[in-house]
């Protein structure tokens, strides 16, 4: 499977046009169906590790929740009976599945399908860009949610064609409960560095994210909002490129250190950021919970983990923006506090340069070219 994927990845990298490689299942899925010791042996024998297989191999993970969880009426093992003339039984079954939509690959009972779905989802806990698409909507809307999620991660503006109200929400948490209160989780060490920018209302930054000595590196450009949605274009970079880009570090900001705890709860993927020292006093003991959802108000509050003491929602509160939290100067005196990342943009949503200032923010599509000249 990995060799087949590598072939397609290489073809895509060598293509002169933009390519999107979509994998039906990924390397970590196998870990859900073999004993943990066996999986660790397989990885060790092949020189692999979870960060490489789970976090850096794929840019985005989407888990489509089985119909057995939330859409049970549409989960069936039976092939409907209809006459297809003199075709043999195998052909009749294929025709039935093709014309009537039954799923020939299903063999699990409802409880078994639910259990296997949980295992498959848990295999990807910890991936930095992991979306769970549940069955809270009709199937067509479920597909639109999936497509919209991909477009959002790629920085593609879909206008209102796929508008379904999903957004990132953030909550302030009062205190960290004992680990035993959490469902299965993965902890990561995360380090953020803000970079210098000469383009108004853009925020370039680097991220180093790792576990057990294995690291992934990401370059992000945060742009002004498009149609009310914040746009962040992310690109994976190598360790060498990361070190080169650190030369652009913005001295107005502290380095941000976090432990990021990733877990699933109620078919919802959550990330709990636990801020660590060294940091500005404003960040000491800070706990922020994030998730992407279409739910709002009281219904959303009911979906939040009951084992966490939620203080309030702080989604659009600039006091809890990582950009502002990392500022070295006190907020009362600094000129760099960002109240809202908005500004003039062109018809494509790109920031308009102010007074002819040249753009020194490295856009992801030009990143490799720029790094090759350093």
Describe each region flagged by the PLM.
Residues 1-19:
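Short, structured active-site "lid" loops
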Residues 148-374:
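Phosphate-end processing signature that detects enzymes handling 5′-triphosphorylated RNA
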């Amino acid at each position: 499977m990995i060799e087949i994927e590598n072939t397609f990845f290489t073809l895509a990298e060598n293509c002169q046009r933009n390519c999107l490689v979509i994998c039906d299942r990924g390397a970590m899925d196998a870990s859900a169906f073999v004993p943990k010791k066996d999986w660790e042996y397989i990885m060790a024998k092949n020189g692999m590790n979870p960060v490489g297989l789970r976090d850096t191999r794929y840019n985005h993970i989407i888990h489509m929740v089985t119909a057995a969880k939330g859409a049970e009426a549409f989960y069936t093992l039976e092939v409907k009976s209809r006459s297809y003339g003199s075709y043999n039984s195998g052909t009749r079954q294929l025709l039935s599945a093709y014309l009537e939509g039954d799923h020939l690959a299903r063999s699990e009972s409802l409880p078994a399908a639910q259990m296997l779905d949980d295992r498959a989802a848990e295999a990807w806990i910890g991936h930095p860009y992991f979306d769970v698409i549940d069955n809270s909507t009709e199937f067509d809307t479920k597909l639109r949610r999936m497509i919209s999620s991909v477009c959002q991660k790629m920085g593609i503006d879909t206008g209102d064609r796929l508008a379904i109200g999903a957004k990132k929400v953030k909550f302030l948490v009062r205190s960290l409960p004992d680990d035993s209160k959490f469902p299965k989780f993965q902890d990561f060490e995360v380090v953020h560095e803000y970079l210098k920018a000469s383009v108004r209302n853009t925020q370039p930054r680097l991220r180093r994210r790792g576990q057990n000595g294995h690291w992934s590196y990401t370059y992000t450009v945060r742009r002004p909002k498009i149609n009310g949605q914040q746009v962040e274009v992310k690109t994976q970079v190598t360790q060498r490129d990361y070190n080169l880009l650190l030369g652009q570090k913005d001295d107005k900001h502290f380095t941000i250190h976090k432990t990021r705890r990733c877990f699933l709860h109620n078919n919802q993927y959550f990330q709990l950021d636990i801020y660590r020292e060294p940091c500005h006093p404003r960040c000491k003991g800070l706990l922020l919970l994030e998730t992407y959802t279409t739910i709002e108000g009281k219904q959303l509050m009911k979906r939040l983990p009951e084992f966490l003491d939620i203080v309030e929602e702080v989604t659009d509160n600039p006091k809890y923006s990582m950009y502002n939290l990392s500022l070295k100067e006190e907020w009362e005196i600094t000129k760099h506090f960002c109240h809202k990342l908005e500004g003039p943009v062109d018809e494509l949503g790109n920031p308009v340069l102010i007074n002819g200032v040249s753009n020194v923010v490295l856009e992801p599509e030009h990143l490799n070219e720029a790094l090759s000249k350093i």
